[in-house]
């Protein structure tokens, strides 16, 4: 009996829509390149969050979390929660872990309450809580989510 652990097949959707997938992947690559170019690796969590948003927008465009309301609303919630949590004093490792976890938990709660669920935005909250927010970070995140929503 053959092991199927490492076997995979190219699906019929790829064979049919390979041009679309290629264009989507190139657009995603360009989008993430621009984000990485403008943000330092100090903001790796935020870059990863935008990367995950890029995947959702291009690979799952019909999904609930790919909707413009969710992408923009979720990241705005993430930015705000992360910023507010970054203002809380956290002098120890334990208090830092608690503040960072609260950024994720509170942003998740607000996204669910406002119907703006976008999982990568919890990463934005975490990244901003950990590194703080600067004008360049704010501009890059907002421009990224707006551009991704337009391309969607």
Region spans (language model):
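Membrane-helix interface "capping/anchor" motifs
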Residues: 62-70, 111-121
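Alpha-helical transmembrane segments and their membrane-interface boundaries
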Residues: 1-101, 132-152
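Generic transmembrane alpha-helix signature in multi-pass membrane proteins
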Residues: 86, 111-114, 123-130
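Internal alpha-helical transmembrane segments of multi-pass membrane proteins
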Residues: 91-117
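Transmembrane helix boundary and interhelical junction motifs in multipass membrane proteins
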Residues: 46-50, 118-124
């Amino acid at each position: 009996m053959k092991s199927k652990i490492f076997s995979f097949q190219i699906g019929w959707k790829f064979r049919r829509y390979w041009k679309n997938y290629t264009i989507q992947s190139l657009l995603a690559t360009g989008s993430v390149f621009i984000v990485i170019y403008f943000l330092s690796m100090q903001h790796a969590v935020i870059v990863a969050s935008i990367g995950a948003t890029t995947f959702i927008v291009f690979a799952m465009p019909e999904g609930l979390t790919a909707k413009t309301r969710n992408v923009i609303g979720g990241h705005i919630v993430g930015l705000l929660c992360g910023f507010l949590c970054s203002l809380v004093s956290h002098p120890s490792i334990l208090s830092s872990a608690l503040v960072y976890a609260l950024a994720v938990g509170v942003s998740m709660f607000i996204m669910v309450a406002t119907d703006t669920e976008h999982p990568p935005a919890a990463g934005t909250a975490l990244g901003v809580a950990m590194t703080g927010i600067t004008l360049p970070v704010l501009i890059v995140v907002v421009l990224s989510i707006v551009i991704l929503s337009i391309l969607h």
